[in-house]
Amino acid sequence: MPRRGPALGDPTDFSYRINKITKIVDGDTIDVLLDMGFDIKYQSRVRLFGIDTPESRTRNKEEKVRGLISKEYLKQALKKAKKLTIKTHKGSETGKFGRILGEIFADGVNLNLKMCTEGYAVQYYGQNKSLVEAEHMKNKSKLIKKGVLKK
């Protein structure tokens, strides 16, 4: 039996073409129109899987600024892309609020990962809030150094 290598993908993953972004809710949530094939479209809210961005709708002004910066970064990345796809994983297709959980690919680049490496998001898999906040503070410093965020 042939071994499955990383280039062959996981048969439990599903990929869909994003026909249209209808709304960017915040840095880790978007509304999309998915192309399901056979001329079938599906409207849904998507939570970017495995990441967390600062809240853009909060009373904490400093966090809100960082949240809006993350939202704008995502908006620009999506806007520039010629081809957008979403990849979901069997067993974790939806989150606790019924949203699709997915990795967004813009022209083949995983935006979930890119947002983390660039300092606009942190990896999130349900860990302690204080650990997540500590990572957000590291990103804050990173964005200040880049000149994206003022002290």
Residue ranges and their predicted role:
Residues 1-151:
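Small beta-barrel nucleic-acid-binding modules, primarily SNase/OB-fold domains
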